[in-house]
Amino acid sequence: PLSSIISFFQNHKLFNFTNRPQWKTVKGGSKNYIKKLIQASHFDIKKSFKIDKIIRDQGVEILSQNKKYQFDLLVLACPPHHFLPLLGDKKEKEASILNAFNFQKNLAQLHQNSSLMPPHKAAWSSWNFHTNTNNKCTLSYWMNLLQPLDTKDEFFVSLNQNQTSNLYQTVYEHPIFSLNTLNSQKEIGKIQGLNDTFYVGSYLGYGFHEDGIQSALKVCKKLNINLGLFNEADTSRIQWN
């Protein structure tokens, strides 16, 4: 929807032709801030933990490999289509809102093929798009500028280009933003806390890391958790009340 695009451009100062903000990136990539969060946490972390079912009746019960784990509250920090099949019968009201969030799988490939970039290097930017006669658009990230990388070799990450020669590839899931999605981003406030369950994730904003963090901060505020320096943190990218 046009309103979403305009709001996105306003929030990211993309309408500014002068005095545009200087973007910053985490040194070493997002894995480093995730590592710091894990190191600073005050809770038990279980990785590669397969969940078979979630029962929410007088608290939360997690079933995993014939074992039961009891909790007071549940915070689901993953896309709805990952957790909805795990929830028990008490999910009709939640599903009516959460089913509006759709995702698309995108093939991401790391390569050195500069032919996908603008012909003139002066026009290269962090994000670049390439179209063909079939009206297919491919997005390419210039990693040397985006990270930045300390090397003379050029590296790019392209989505859905299906390069035959690539250094690495993986598949990501990205949220699809429709009018129903934007409405559900506001409606999800009605089910936050229902059945002792809360929802966080970048799909509640614009799909960026910042949106995932802001959605988590907003849930913490709703639970009256003391966040210290983050008590006054901005959560304006998340629309539910």
PLM feature spans:
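Conserved beta-strand termini and adjacent loop/short-helix elements that scaffold enzyme active sites
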Residues: S48-K50, Q65, V200
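Active-site/ligand-binding neighborhood in enzyme catalytic cores
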Residues: P1-F49, K53, D57
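A structural signal for the hydrophobic beta-strands that form the central parallel beta-sheet
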Residues: I45-K47, L76, Y199
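A structural signal for well-ordered alpha-helical segments within the folded catalytic domains
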Residues: G28-K35, H81, Q214-L217
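Mid-domain catalytic core of redox enzymes
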Residues: D52-F177
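Active-site catalytic microenvironments for nucleophilic, acid-base chemistry
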Residues: A40, D44, D89, K222, ...
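Conserved flavin/dinucleotide-binding core of flavoenzymes
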Residues: N135-N241
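Short, well-ordered alpha-helix to beta-strand connector turns
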Residues: S41, F71-D72, N195
